[in-house]
Amino acid sequence: NLALGAVLAIALVGCAKPLPAEKIAYAGTWTSADSRVNITITPEGRVEYSNEQPGKSSSVSAPIKSFDGDNFDAGIGPLSTEFKVTQPPKQDAQGNWFMIIDGHTLAKVQ
């Protein structure tokens, strides 16, 4: 059973496609001011997301399936989560990067 899990995990890692060149600014670790929402997007096309709100939490660890404008879907097979990006990555005058995903303003920390 453990071996099957390891093979499945390796197979799932292999499903990620690199970020398109025009979306490379999405890559990095992003966090909300209260640290309750965190997302890491790798250049290889994987998402590690957590949203820890009082009484409700969610997390996603999956490859990015596709982009639709600024939004993106992450998941495997028929299971997927849409991330609504209302502000794509943008650098302010001080050189800090921000974006808004699912209504949460996130700052790039790495």
Can you say where each PLM-predicted feature lies in the sequence?
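Sec-dependent bacterial lipoprotein signal peptides
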Residues: 1-16
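Edge beta-strand at a domain terminus
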Residues: 98-110
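N-terminal glycine/threonine-rich, aromatic-flanked beta-hairpin/loop signature
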Residues: 35-80
